[in-house]
């Protein structure tokens, strides 16, 4: 018996297919897989879902078109002429600070490692495990979201270089774990920290949720990842600098200087991108994101992995994290929340502000020669006075 039903491929579906084909790359990035033009919408429920998603897509498209950073740019494949000089300068700073894991001398660290107390070794190994995993998460966000959304060439240059540096950071932390930890089972436990350590998993999940949130706008996610690099890393950086103050682990502490400088620059760049946004998240939204990150970091370093294990004061560490959060809020253009002083004098010149003199000091001479100099600095003359 032949059916009298009309085919499912109706005029409505053809319209859907046409709309899908005409969508820009940015729209497709935010489009659920179920809206593929090859997928048949076989029920009223599915059609309703599509209509709602289409409305959200149009709203997002309007927001994208209003943002110069996200607006489709046909000139994005060529760098010159420079349009955003402040963003380009950030890229050149990142380029000038390039280094590799092979340049860090770990030969003296093993002797120090063996002389540490058990609780000190426990703390350091767990902090390194968090760091080794977190840089990969930052890269996941850059590859999956930011580099696909941002259309400004200068910013794409920075993100591309940041990806390379995050890989070097992750390699460095993995190398440190490989050097210090001789037991293969313990090494495997540390390398898989996101699955094996609940305290690390909580921080990782927070960041991963922001990557996967298709409804969160770019501005909110920029703030979230500024918090990851500016707050989630800050307490752990401070704990390793505390070891430096005690004259311990020279290889670990030197690599920590290099990495904290890099992360400071990455955090500054996030704040710069935020300032370029036309439609910024509200102050309430920004402060909610920052304060949530502060709570998680305070719990991490005073409860889950307390800094008292290495002789630091937990209350002062809480205060330091609040101080760092206030500084980040100021850089984003908002008022402080916590209004506390920096309790760690040894962190005064090692802040997470890439624009401080910490960067200009060329730590360990790791600023590439000539990269930050102007073209006139490279001229040859014979008019020197003798």
UniProtKB/Swiss-Prot annotation:
Q: Where is the composition biased (Polar residues)?
A: 1-24
- Cofactor requirements of the protein: Fe cation
Q: Provide the E.C. number(s) assigned to this enzyme.
A: 1.17.4.1
**Binding residues for Fe cation 1:** 135, 166, 169
- Protein name as annotated: Ribonucleoside-diphosphate reductase subunit M2
Q: Give me the Gene Ontology terms describing cellular component.
A: cytosol
- Identify which top EC class this enzyme belongs to: oxidoreductase
Region Disordered, residue ranges: 1-36
**Do you know which Pfam families this protein is assigned to?**
Ribonuc_red_sm
Record note on cofactor: Binds 2 iron ions per subunit.
Annotated InterPro entries: Ferritin-like_SF, RNR-like, RNR_small, RNR_small_AS, RNR_small_fam
Which residues, renumbered to this chain, carry the PTM Phosphoserine? 6
- Family assignment from sequence similarity: Belongs to the ribonucleoside diphosphate reductase small chain family.
Q: Which residues form the active site?
A: 173
The biological process GO terms on file are: deoxyribonucleotide biosynthetic process
Binding residue positions for Fe cation 2: 166, 229, 263, 266
Keywords assigned by UniProt, alphabetized = Cytoplasm, Deoxyribonucleotide synthesis, Iron, Metal-binding, Oxidoreductase, Phosphoprotein
Reaction catalyzed: a 2'-deoxyribonucleoside 5'-diphosphate + [thioredoxin]-disulfide + H2O = a ribonucleoside 5'-diphosphate + [thioredoxin]-dithiol
Q: Which CDD domains match?
A: RNRR2 (cd01049)
Give its localization.
Answer: Cytoplasm
**Assembly and partners?**
Heterodimer of a large and a small subunit.
Task: Give the modified residues of type Phosphothreonine.
Answer: 31
Its function, per the record, reads: Provides the precursors necessary for DNA synthesis. Catalyzes the biosynthesis of deoxyribonucleotides from the corresponding ribonucleotides.
């Amino acid at each position: 018996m032949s059916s009298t039903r009309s085919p499912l491929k109706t005029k409505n579906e053809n319209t859907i297919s046409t709309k899908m084909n005409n969508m820009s790359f940015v729209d497709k990035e935010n489009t659920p897989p179920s809206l593929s033009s090859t997928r048949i919408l076989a029920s009223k429920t599915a059609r309703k879902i599509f209509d709602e998603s289409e409305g959200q897509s149009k709203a997002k498209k309007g927001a994208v078109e209003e943002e110069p950073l996200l607006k489709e740019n046909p000139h994005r494949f060529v760098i010159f002429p420079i349009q955003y000089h402040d963003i380009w300068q950030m890229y050149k700073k990142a380029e000038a600070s390039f280094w590799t894991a092979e340049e860090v001398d770990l030969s003296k660290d093993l002797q120090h490692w063996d002389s540490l107390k058990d609780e000190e070794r426990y703390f350091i190994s767990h902090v390194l495990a968090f760091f080794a995993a977190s840089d990969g998460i930052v890269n996941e966000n850059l590859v999956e979201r930011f580099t696909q959304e941002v259309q400004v060439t200068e910013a794409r240059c920075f993100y591309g270089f940041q990806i390379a540096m995050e890989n070097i950071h992750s390699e460095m932390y993995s190398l440190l774990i490989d050097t210090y930890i001789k037991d293969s089972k313990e090494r495997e436990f540390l390398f898989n920290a996101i699955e094996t350590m609940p305290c690390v998993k909580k921080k990782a999940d927070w960041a991963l949720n922001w990557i996967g949130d298709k409804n969160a706008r770019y501005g909110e996610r920029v703030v979230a990842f500024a918090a990851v690099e500016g707050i989630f890393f800050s307490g752990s950086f401070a704990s390793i600098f505390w070891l430096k103050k005690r004259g311990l682990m020279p290889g670990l502490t030197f690599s920590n200087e290099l990495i904290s400088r890099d992360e400071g620059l990455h955090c500054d760049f996030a704040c710069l991108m935020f300032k370029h946004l036309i439609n910024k998240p509200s102050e309430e939204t920004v402060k909610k994101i920052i304060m949530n990150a502060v709570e998680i970091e305070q719990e991490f370093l005073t409860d889950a992995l307390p800094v008292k294990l290495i002789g630091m004061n937990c209350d002062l560490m809480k205060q330091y994290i609040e101080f760092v959060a206030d500084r980040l809020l100021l850089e984003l253009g908002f008022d402080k929340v916590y209004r506390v002083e920096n309790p760690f004098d040894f962190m005064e010149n090692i802040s997470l502000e890439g624009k401080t003199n910490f960067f200009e000091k060329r730590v360990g001479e790791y600023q590439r020669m000539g990269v930050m100099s102007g073209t006139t600095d490279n001229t040859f003359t014979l008019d020197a006075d003798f």
